[in-house]
Amino acid sequence: RASVKQVLNVDKRTPSVLAIARSDRLKDSDRHPHEIANNTDFASLLSGERSSWFCNDIDNYPHYKSTSVSRGYKSTIVWPVLTRVAAEDLMGTFAEDGAGYKPIVAFLCLDSAVPGIFNEEQHVPLGWAVSDALARLYEAQRSFWEPDISIESSK
């Protein structure tokens, strides 16, 4: 499965994500924001600890956290969608990368119910190409990606 999760940073203290696109049907749990701090993959990307998240066996990853009620996946790859536009022009949140801040506006997520399904050397670079294309689309059509405020405020 593939999904795009928009970063919401309404109050700057509790950044969260909201699923805005999925390869399968959106579930009810996708219709409300999930705090980034409670999701190991998003938190590690936002903190700059990793540039992408790759895990072929989530069940055996120590202290893995996810706010997805019924996760249903065993393997996952997550890429940040990074834009090149000025930070003040973007909705989103920012991760320290050592040389300044990088705007993370969304996450591209790929997961599978099968453990060990992904090949890091092949799939991670391919995902970066898709993530970069999403970032260019986001820069060009920001309003297309803006979440429905009624969904966000019903939290």
Per-segment meaning from a language model:
Residues 100-155:
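Juxtadomain coupling helices with adjacent low-complexity linkers
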Residues 13-15, 87, 119-121:
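Generic domain-boundary/flexible-linker signal
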Residues 61, 84-85, 113-118:
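Short acidic, S/G/P-rich loop/turn micro-motifs used as interaction or catalytic elements
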Residues 3-77:
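Regulatory sensory and allosteric helical modules in signal-transduction proteins
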Residues 63-103:
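Helix-to-coil/beta transition segments that act as allosteric "coupling" elements at the rims
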Residues 7, 80-81, 110-112:
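Short loop/turn segments at strand-loop or loop-helix junctions that form parts
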Residues 31-35, 67-70, 91-92, 119-125, ...:
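Surface-exposed beta-strand edges and their flanking turn/coil or helix-capping segments
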Residues 1-4, 130:
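Amphipathic alpha-helical coiled-coil segments that mediate homodimerization
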